[in-house]
Amino acid sequence: MSGNSIGQNFVVTTFGESHGVALGCIIDGCPPGLELTEADMQHDLDRRRPGTSRYTTARREPDEVRILSGVFEGKTTGTSIGLLIENTDQRSQDYSNIKDLFRPGHADYTYQQKYGLRDYRGGGRSSARETAMRVAAGAVAKKYLKQVHGINIQGYMSQLGPISAETLDFSQIEQNAFFFPDASKLEALDEYMRELKKSGDSIGAKISVVATGVPVGLGEPVFDRLDADIAHALMGINAVKGVEIGDGFGVVTQKGSEGRDLMSPLGFESNHAGGILGGISSGQPIVAHIALKPTSSISVPGQSMTAQGEMAEVVTKGRHDPCVGIRAVPIAEAMLAIVLMDHLLRHRAQNQDVCSHTPILGMR
């Protein structure tokens, strides 16, 4: 099975399954000398881990990460960093009834057809449990980006079902279980989720992620444009069905006179492009959004078929998130961090000595 790595200079490779012994990853290309401990990664892992609120799956995993290699006396050595998280709360018996049954909307059917067999326990490799290692690797990238280059990355839930944030207060994001920036909507979100759980159904969500302090010049046209690699990384998150950079699909109804980001010696007057022009970072905040589908692991009966081609009814019995978007915020942050880290190292390798006499613009 290929496709388990991302990046060229900062390379992250993950391994492991939802109900396997452990999850792990290898990070290649991290510069030496970065102070790094398990605690640096644990904060983001705790933000992502299951069982932390009544709105997420009841599966309880501590997600305690261990550093196996690449760190000596508290600093990265420049060699491969090995990370491991053991699975401790598997209940594989919850899935015995779907051993030969395809869950609609899941990867069961496609994995079976591609590989000729599948790990039916919680979806195996296709489970979002795998993203724990992306979050761990992303935390390493986030620390380097912030400590060495002053780059900050912040994600938040901008919409859950029909409820959208009308204000953006970053101080509220970590104060509630939804990572929601609009405190006035928290009561409505709570009520909506309560009713959703009663019905046994699920709902989709929109997650936004912003990177500030990104220097001008990251991105490698034409096939490794920064926005293309960001879209690739974000689209690779489980349940993501859409990615927007900047105004995204909103540009369809914009006129050129509205959508262009006007410039002056004082800076850019807007950021419709989301901080990327021609596939290269402009120095403005990088803004991306992802749409996550509602999980089809629900207790509402649905029609499907068995591996033998017979009709069957599916009712999910395992422990699942009624809205997978709630735990997706640190995952989106991690994937953006991994891409920015990779492109920063690539830019440094080729363009470190480039000197442009054009003034660097900020936001007005």
Swiss-Prot record:
Catalysed reactions listed for this entry: 5-O-(1-carboxyvinyl)-3-phosphoshikimate = chorismate + phosphate
GO molecular function: chorismate synthase activity; FMN binding
Entry binding sites for FMN: 125-127, 238-239, 278, 293-297, 319
Co-factor: note: Reduced FMN (FMNH(2)).
Gene3D superfamilies (alphabetical): Chorismate synthase AroC
Pathway(s) it belongs to: Metabolic intermediate biosynthesis; chorismate biosynthesis; chorismate from D-erythrose 4-phosphate and phosphoenolpyruvate: step 7/7
Swiss-Prot/TrEMBL keywords: Amino-acid biosynthesis, Aromatic amino acid biosynthesis, FAD, Flavoprotein, FMN, Lyase, NADP
HAMAP family reported in the protein's UniProt record: Chorismate_synth
Function comment: This reaction introduces a second double bond into the aromatic ring system.
Classification via NCBIfam families: aroC, PRK05382.1
Descriptive protein name: Chorismate synthase
Organism per entry: Shewanella sp. (strain MR-4)
Lineage: Bacteria, Pseudomonadati, Pseudomonadota, Gammaproteobacteria, Alteromonadales
